[in-house]
Amino acid sequence: MSNKDQTNLLNNLKDIAQKAGLDISEELAKINAKLESSTALSKTWERVELARHSDRPRTLDYINLIFDNFTELHGDRFFGDDPAMIGGIGFIDGMPVTVIGTQKGRNLRETIDRNGGMANPEGYRKAMRLAKQAEKFKRPIITFIDTQGAYPGLGAEERGIGEAIAFNLREFSRLKTPIICIIIGEGGSGGALGIGVGDKIYMLENAIFSVISPEGCASILLRDSSRAKDAAAMLKITSQEVLDLKVINGIIPEPEKGAHTDPKKTADAIKEQILKDLADLTKRDPAVLVKYRSKKIRSIGKYSE
């Protein structure tokens, strides 16, 4: 039953009660509260589904739409190359920048090749290598985040996935060059944070950002994996909720029915925001950038009664 049908049914019930001289205001208030809760759950889950939509533009799509002459660079110089993590150099309105991002697949073959966008330690070490290179040559860094999380496999653990992410968190906060991070789909846990420390952090309107997936939270905390929708609402993962928590700097709008309906329009909105921030950040002293970036990151999650 749609929200409109539910509203009409309640209005009819209210009219019948009034004609019969009955006071059902208390019961109606309880029903309305349940409907509002149900609507909130539905809206949150709609965002989750849009963030995971199979046709949603990926990192490479935005790279091709926003940057000129992109040249991909490979390898972490420790173990190997990770196809789940894209990195390279491109130009935006003539300005050279380093672009880094997690890459999901579009079909089964690509998803397998890209490991579903879940990077291994070598992916995060490659990202760090390119970030250090960007600092050396005074290039701004743009990161695109779209991942369920870092890969949780045995090999990843053996090669130090936790250390790789922790190292990135520390080093990205110290880089003396502008960093802009954009969550374009799923921003999952430490996998997102590994390339998510920046001077400016944005989410696309229908992206999500969370410490754990709704399914994982439902299984662990609620002891019922079928309650993923409830968990999603509890986690406060939508762009507006994350903005309200002051974790991000802003929301980049999408077409009404999602980024996949008009990738070019979405890319144009992202490009506009990047150029606006670069015009400001590139004028700042590198030491000042680091100072305010560190302060920003340390203030996330700060709470006082």
From Swiss-Prot:
It is found in: Cytoplasm. Disulfide bonds: none annotated. Keywords: ATP-binding, Cytoplasm, Fatty acid biosynthesis, Fatty acid metabolism, Lipid biosynthesis, Lipid metabolism, Nucleotide-binding, Transferase. This is Acetyl-coenzyme A carboxylase carboxyl transferase subunit alpha. Belongs to the AccA family. Its EC number is 2.1.3.15. SUPFAM superfamilies: ClpP/crotonase. Pathway: Lipid metabolism; malonyl-CoA biosynthesis; malonyl-CoA from acetyl-CoA: step 1/1. It is an enzyme of class 2 (transferase). GO terms for molecular function: acetyl-CoA carboxylase activity; ATP binding; carboxyl- or carbamoyltransferase activity. NCBIfam families: accA, AccA_sub, PRK05724.1.
